[in-house]
Amino acid sequence: MTTLASSYDPSSFESRLYAQWEAAGYFVPSDTGEPYTVLLPPPNVTGTLHMGHAFQQTLMDALVRYHRMRGYDTLWQVGTDHAGIATEMVVSRNLALEGKGETRDSLGREGFIAKVWEWNAASGDTIERQMRRLGTSSDWSRSTFTMDPQPSAAVNEAFVRWYEQGLIYRGQRLVNWDPVLKTAISDLEVENVEEDGFLWSIRYPLADGVTYEHIEHDADGNETLRETRDYLVVATTRPETMLGDTAVMVHPEDARYLTLHTARIVLPLTGRHVPVITDDYVDRAFGTGVVKVTPAHDFNDYQVGERHNLPLVNLFTADAKIIDPRKQYPDDESPFVNAGIDWRELDQIQRKRLGQHLAYKIPAQYIGLDRYDARKLVLSELEDLSILVETKPHKLQVPRGDRTGQVIEPYLTDQWFVKMDALAKRGLELVESGQIQFVPPNWINTYRHWMENIQDWCISRQLWWGHRIPAWFDDAGHCHVGHDEAEVRAKHGLGAEIALHQDSDVLETWFSSQLWPFSTLGWPDSQAMAERGFARYLPSSVLVTGFDIIFFWVARMIMATDSFTGQVPFRDVYITGLIRDAQGQKMSKSKGNVLDPLDIIDGISIEDLVAKRTNGLMQPRMAEKIEKATRKEFPDGIIAHGADALRFTIAALATHGRDIKFDLGRAEGYKNFCNKLWNATRFVLMNTEGARFTGVPQPRTEAEKWILARLDKVTAETHAHYANYRFDLLAQSLYEFAWNAFCDWFVELAKPALNNQDTDAAASTRHTLLYVLESLLRLLHPLTPFVTEELWQQVVPRLGITTATISLQRFPQVGDVDTSGYATAEADVEWLKSMVSALRRVRSELNVPPSKQVRLLLQADTADERPRVARFASQLSFLLKLERIDWLDAGQDTPPSAAAIVGELTLLVPLEGLVDMDAERMRLDKEIKRVKGEIGKCNGKLGNATFVQNAPAVVVDQERARLADWTTQLAGLREQRGKL
């Protein structure tokens, strides 16, 4: 007797099965077979599983399970990232919520880091717990945290090697600076937001009594103004930064300013003289064609300053207030160079000192002001001087920190950098030579653009949590780099009497993440490398990740892995789109549209969902709006769908597009799919009680041959879709086979054989039912592991299969069944399906009760179809509840009947006693209209010369055949309509 539950309830078996898999060690690498390695992009330890994680992890798990079933030695390397900034923010917020008065600063570095480790121990396994619920089949014993001793040793080794190779240096450059966090941040952590602002035009007086003839023209080239001016007009969106200007620039070929190339201007409010320089960067058509240059507070201006050797005047403190130069640079108030020296001839030390000296020219009333208060004062004083020419609205791209929401400041500070040019050149070669493949390939263009426009990488962060930079300074300011202080002292002969202090900065998290492909395999420790399979599992097979981190992570892994190991990190890079909500909006806490994958799996009440979406908002005022929208969208909360339904939904949505809209309605549909599979399995089990088969079926019926041929085709499609990372097509193909071919058709077509007195046909049909179902479960397993395992365990004893789990059962292969002689059976069953569909449509439209038997009349111009009808008479009668089947001669009068056409065959159901004649006339009129529409479509294509000339001949022939078929159907329908 079958022990399968009567209804599909994923909560009754999913967690149980995962615990069994893990306990049995099914996910541990086998050390046999060809290696197949997948790298999990390590999620932040601060976070929880969101839809983006679930999306990518489902696809990764499907790949791993698929290859494991094909005999590969699979390693799915998982772990978490220490997430420096995010973790510090979370722990600081938790300290505030505890109400003990403890803060990051009051605890000090060591105390705060101890708190971070406490928090990490309590919450660090959240992601792994959620991944298990999703069904990820990874070897958790190899899970790695980027702050573990092994990867930490790899970070130190990488830093020291690159430093010794001259690739890492310490210097003063512009970085993205968050004035709230008081640290540099990466470009990925900056969001450029379009906002309304202003463009202010300011007169900059020319120095030394210089004047020029200013001429303006209209769009047609007509002169509209000519006057002598002793000033230039400069437009800016950040007037407060003019206090740090060290030049104004014009285009070298701008005729308006040719006489001013050696001039100077008097910088308003400071009285400093700064040069007029020429640079191709200037857009002559924008504004007046005169641009202020503030190298310390604008990334483009910084590049100009580097080209022209301009001094850099840093205006701001770390929290974006105007500096007090006497505190910041106490030794640089007096000039230190000959007053007559050309600024273009300054060396780097002189240039830096000059910038610090020029900061003393900042007027005293500005010192200590917040940047926006300084802006107000600058504008007020410019107005008082009557040199604020114009103020007009202007759209701005404002850089804001993605965590604090604050405007990010281009900030001049001492940081550690990696020289990127040589690394990037090599990284581009590895991709363009084909050693690394991008899927879809168009993302190579994005990769190429970034690599060809690369800048040196700022790797230091002003945080406490993270990998501390392995550099020590003595009291004289000399820097020494090494793996630890003892090595530094020994290497440089520094005795105990020389005080050393380690750099207080930490490395940004991308520095450790770039080492992920090989630090997780034990590098650089030779014993750990041997134990963890460095030589076997590097390069990994595929990286599945989003396009938003191609440069920040993918490119850096390529460059670092090549630099440190001489290998590529992975063979394929499968770039996924980004998950958005059903309206195409980005999912975010602030929008209140985030879906927790576990809520889709296990369900959640509306009250809990509202609480989850509104608690802890950065903008509490949004809570009411979010609650209202949530209650409208999910009035009853979210029902439990189970992990398999979510996974199949994700696969079905995984197109190669840039954006992927997640529709919860799709998950409901795929829950129904799992339910249908469950019910079909119950049918098979109930009809094969006591059966025991081995080997491949020897089919005796056309229906068996047809389904086995379809199985072979869907198997081929499955392998092709995995190879091309087309999970959407994979899901579609498997869905069509499972739902339509197997459940809707073969199960129905099997019923006549199962109820037939031909015991051999019944036995072979039972064998084929079990065989195809078992194969289907294996095909589906990588996408829907739980339901397939639960069903498979019930099916396989009847097939003599003793493998403990479907996870390790061989994946179906093309040719498992020899279907080479099944073409006729395939055609016959497709004909039978057409017959059944046509008659069922007639019965439905006539509202004939399912249990009522009807008479079927058949009519054709030839006798060709009579043998086939005879062969399938029992199936037709069984499936269509036919009282009898009779033939009419061609041209013979027919009684009033409901008609359908299948090929050359007219199907007639006499209406006497069945239906209202008026209703049948309406039905025929409707069917005639439908067929006319199909004929119109065919004629439209065949009447299009471009289609006929350019489409493959087989496609054109198919269209002509369709036209002939529809035309035949129309004639038959019109004939029947005429009789009514």
Curated annotation (Swiss-Prot):
Main location: cytoplasm
Binding site for ATP: K589
GO MF terms held by the record: aminoacyl-tRNA deacylase activity; ATP binding; valine-tRNA ligase activity
Coiled-coil region list: 914-980
Its biological purpose: Catalyzes the attachment of valine to tRNA(Val). As ValRS can inadvertently accommodate and process structurally similar amino acids such as threonine, to avoid such errors, it has a 'posttransfer' editing activity that hydrolyzes mischarged Thr-tRNA(Val) in a tRNA-dependent manner.
Recorded name of the encoding gene: valS
Keywords associated with the record: Aminoacyl-tRNA synthetase, ATP-binding, Coiled coil, Cytoplasm, Ligase, Nucleotide-binding, Protein biosynthesis
Signal sequence annotation: none
Subcellular location: Cytoplasm
GO cellular component: cytosol
Protein name: Valine--tRNA ligase
Record's catalysed reaction(s): tRNA(Val) + L-valine + ATP = L-valyl-tRNA(Val) + AMP + diphosphate
Source organism of the structure: Xanthomonas oryzae pv. oryzae (strain MAFF 311018)
Motif stretch ('KMSKS' region): 586-590
Record-linked InterPro entries: aa-tRNA-synth_I_CS, aa-tRNA-synth_Ia, Anticodon_Ia_Val, M/V/L/I-tRNA-synth_anticd-bd, Rossmann-like_a/b/a_fold, tRNA-bd_arm, tRNAsynth_Ia_anticodon-bd, Val-tRNA_synth_C_sf
